[in-house]
């Protein structure tokens, strides 16, 4: 009998600590209880920060230690009673009661329904739901603290003055509101702004479709998790973010020190993606009006071109807040000389890699020339910028908080009196005349030394390659290649690759070759060059291009390939006339051939190779239209048991890069599969991933494919000019395989062997999920290159360096 009583007592003790599914009038949440989200991602309950005696109701990540609190209900009013509880009142509002049953905190709004309950969703949103209608009566996502989760948002509404902001904790042990807040401004376009009290502390620059233009290291090729929606007519705007990584949990937080941080969980610990501000130059207005903060090491303040310190004494003491003043007054005769600038007309000085000043105004000019003319014709216009993803911005008045980045900034044109540049030119002539003779002598000496260095370097290169395992690959002399290509004649140029031009050549024995000439500015250095030679020399497959040899001559580096008569696949499928030469059977054969080449790289060769830059222009076609995978400069070899790797240098072509690779630098067989899926859909549809837009919402190719598959099974995705040559079920099957290859999560994508099996058999296919880039409009996607040539850019980030091509 005693054992039974003990068991009952034990159950009574344990029961209150169990997680609740919901809170209602009859089931309040006590201090010893918690409320879990259905999937177990988040938990709500009472907590004491840093082991203080104060109790708060908060939400945190359930399975992560140490605890990270993402929302607090009673920030200003902690409870100390162990009898406190959270419940639903008779009028439907959520209330927190202390031990005396006094209301400590509430949602502050009474509802007509008293039949409701509160639950915690898997998004981390704590909601009060009407049991009758199912409507949300209140939600924590509309009452943010210091943290944003995916699907929550900052907002403003100028019609009623409302805004939703993040507010810091006062300290790590005190969740009451601190002195810093993060908001989005009602400017067009908006920008993120951290305030210290009411004073601007940091800003991220105007929004440019996929990025905030004032964050260093992030340019138009950045794969952004952010999204901004503004309705100019309604005076509303919102900012949110989504998790593009291969992980479920992430958050944006504002620390008590005023730093905005973005973190995600990789399964072991939290990874920091961004932390802003990160440099003294990021602090608002550090160098005063018309000052320029240069992010050098150490950072320094300068005056903008044509300006001088307002107070030399204060400037010399390091007190730069008074800023600078114009050295020469503007002539402002622009209106009378719109077409021809006289000698007294104001001019614009171009600055590069700049965080543009605050207090911009959007001007609806259609191009940069109109933007320039509009500013020139307005005497109060002190500067203008024409930014990709935004358009024309102008500044009327002081230029405040201008920052000089080392790279990845914007162009800014500041208005100056013409005499400013004229004086500069005269000084340059004097200096140039004085030192020209010295420079000439130095150059002669340098040329001699460079010649000697190149001779030694050339020998070193050759010796280096001799030590490598490059059997079957010949070394060609430069004069042989120059003769074969008619001295790299423009008429022999086949195209432009990501690392330089490609030429057609003919050797003395009549054999035709393709010559890849690596540009010194291309970004492919010694590592990529060595990589491509050593890799391809070991790879032999009918669906891989064959390397015949290489050439090194000083700074010149060349690769010599077998010549492909039909050049690359993109020439055919995107050309309105040539596309008819590739009917559906040929396209299906090309898809299968690429898959076989990938299978060889991933599974069947003696090396396991991840290509990392699979795209339509890297598929060459022989005289029978058989595909051959080319361009192995970015490829990586894996060890026998290795299936995944990561890199700080993310390289590839935007649109083809998988989310986990573009965002986290993780690459594997599955990242090549993602690229293959995009490539498949381009071959089927005849539409470029980087150019195709459809619908009022400017959706891209993946969204178009998803809609096609949902509506017709995908059979209508095929280029309509080719429908007479195909079997609809075969096209629909390929579309479904393509969608499976571009799944957001790598684990949901098939491997290469499975893909080839799907293409060559009639087995049932899994049902694909909606691709992540089909959820958002094209405006929410990363900016993609708009021409057939590859574009190389370098974007340095906290965790990785992205190079889009």
UniProtKB/Swiss-Prot annotation:
Phylogenetic lineage: Eukaryota, Viridiplantae, Streptophyta, Embryophyta, Tracheophyta
Record's bilayer topology term: Single-pass type I membrane protein
Designated name of the protein: G-type lectin S-receptor-like serine/threonine-protein kinase SD1-29
Transmembrane regions: 429-449
Domain Bulb-type lectin: 22-141
Residue ranges annotated as Extracellular topological domain: 22-428
Signal peptide stretch: 1-21
Region (CaM-binding) residue spans: 577-594
PANTHER family: G-TYPE LECTIN S-RECEPTOR-LIKE SERINE_THREONINE-PROTEIN KINASE SD1-29, RECEPTOR-LIKE SERINE/THREONINE-PROTEIN KINASE SD1-8
């Amino acid at each position: 009998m005693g054992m039974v009583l003990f068991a009952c007592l034990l159950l009574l003790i344990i029961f209150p600590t169990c997680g609740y599914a919901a809170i209602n009038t009859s089931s309040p949440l006590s201090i010893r209880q918690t409320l879990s989200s259905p999937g177990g991602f988040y938990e709500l309950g009472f907590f004491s920060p840093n082991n203080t005696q104060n109790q708060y109701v908060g939400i945190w990540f359930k399975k992560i230690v140490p605890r990270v609190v993402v929302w607090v209900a009673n920030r200003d009013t902690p409870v100390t009673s162990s009898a406190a509880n959270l419940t639903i009142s008779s009028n439907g509002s959520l209330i927190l009661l202390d031990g005396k049953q006094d209301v400590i905190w509430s949602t502050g709004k009474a509802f007509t329904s008293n039949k409701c309950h509160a639950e915690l969703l898997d998004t981390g949103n704590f909601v009060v739901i009407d049991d009758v209608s199912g409507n949300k009566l209140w939600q924590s996502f509309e009452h943010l603290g210091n943290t944003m989760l995916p699907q929550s948002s900052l907002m403003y509404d100028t019609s009623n003055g409302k805004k939703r902001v993040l507010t810091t904790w006062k300290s790590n042990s005190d969740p009451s509101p601190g002195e810093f807040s993060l908001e989005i401004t009602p400017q067009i376009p908006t920008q993120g702004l951290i305030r210290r009290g009411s004073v601007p502390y940091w800003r991220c620059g105007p929004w440019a479709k996929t990025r905030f233009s004032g964050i260093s290291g992030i340019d138009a090729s950045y794969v952004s998790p952010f999204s901004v929606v503004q309705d100019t007519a309604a005076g509303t705007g919102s900012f949110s973010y989504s998790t593009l990584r291969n992980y479920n949990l992430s958050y944006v937080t504002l620390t008590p020190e005023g730093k905005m941080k973005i973190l995600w969980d990789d399964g072991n610990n939290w990874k920091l993606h961004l932390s802003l501000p990160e440099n003294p130059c990021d602090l608002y207005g550090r160098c005063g009006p018309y000052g320029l903060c240069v992010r050098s090491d150490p950072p320094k303040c300068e005056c903008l071109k044509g300006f001088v310190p307002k107070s030399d004494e204060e400037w010399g003491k390091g007190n730069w807040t008074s800023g600078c003043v114009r050295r020469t007054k503007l002539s402002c005769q622009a209106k009378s000389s719109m077409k021809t600038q006289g000698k007294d007309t104001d001019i614009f000085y171009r600055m590069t890699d700049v965080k543009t000043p605050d207090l911009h105004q959007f001007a609806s000019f259609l191009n940069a020339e109109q933007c320039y003319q509009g500013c020139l014709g307005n005497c109060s216009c002190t500067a203008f910028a024409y930014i990709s993803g935004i358009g024309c911005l102008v500044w009327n008045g002081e230029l405040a908080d201008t920052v000089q980045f080392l790279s990845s900034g914007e162009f800014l044109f500041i208005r100056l009196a013409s005499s400013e540049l004229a004086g500069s030119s005269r000084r340059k002539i004097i200096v140039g005349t004085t030192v020209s003779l010295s420079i000439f002598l130095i150059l002669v000496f340098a040329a001699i030394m460079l010649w000697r260095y190149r001779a030694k370097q050339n020998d070193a290169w050759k010796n280096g390659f001799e030590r490598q395992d490059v059997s079957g690959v010949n070394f060609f002399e430069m004069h042989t290649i120059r003769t074969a290509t008619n001295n790299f004649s423009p008429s022999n140029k086949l195209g432009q690759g990501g690392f330089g031009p490609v030429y057609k050549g003919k050797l003395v024995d009549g054999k035709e070759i393709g010559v890849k000439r690596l540009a010194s500015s291309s970004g492919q250095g010694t590592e990529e060059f060595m990589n491509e030679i050593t890799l391809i020399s070991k790879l032999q497959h009918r669906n891989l291009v064959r390397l015949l040899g290489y050439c090194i001559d000083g700074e010149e580096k060349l690769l010599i390939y077998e010549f492909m008569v039909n050049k690359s696949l993109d020439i055919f499928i995107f050309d309105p006339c040539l596309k008819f030469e590739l009917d559906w059977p040929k396209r299906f054969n090309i898809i299968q051939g690429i898959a076989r080449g990938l299978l060889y790289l991933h599974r069947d060769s003696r090396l396991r190779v991840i290509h990392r830059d699979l795209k339509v222009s890297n598929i060459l076609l022989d005289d029978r239209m058989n595909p051959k995978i080319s361009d192995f400069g970015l490829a990586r070899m894996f060890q026998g048991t290795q299936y995944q790797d990561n890199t700080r240098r993310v390289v590839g072509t935007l649109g083809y890069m998988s989310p986990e690779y573009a965002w986290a630098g993780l690459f594997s067989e599955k990242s090549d599969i993602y690229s293959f899926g995009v490539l498949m859909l381009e071959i089927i549809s005849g539409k470029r991933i980087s150019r195709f837009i459809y619908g009022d919402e400017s959706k891209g190719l993946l969204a178009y494919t998803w809609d096609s598959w949902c509506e017709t099974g995908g059979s209508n995705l095929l280029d309509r000019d080719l429908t007479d040559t195909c079997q609809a079920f075969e096209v629909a099957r390929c579309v479904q395989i393509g969608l499976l290859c571009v799944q957001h999560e790598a684990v949901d994508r098939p491997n290469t062997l499975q893909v080839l099996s799907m293409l060559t058999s009639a087995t049932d296919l899994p049902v694909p999920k909606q691709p992540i880039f089909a959820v958002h409009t094209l405006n929410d996607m990363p900016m993609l290159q708009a021409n057939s040539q590859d574009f190389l850019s370098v974007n340095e980030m906290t965790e990785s360096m992205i190079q889009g091509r």
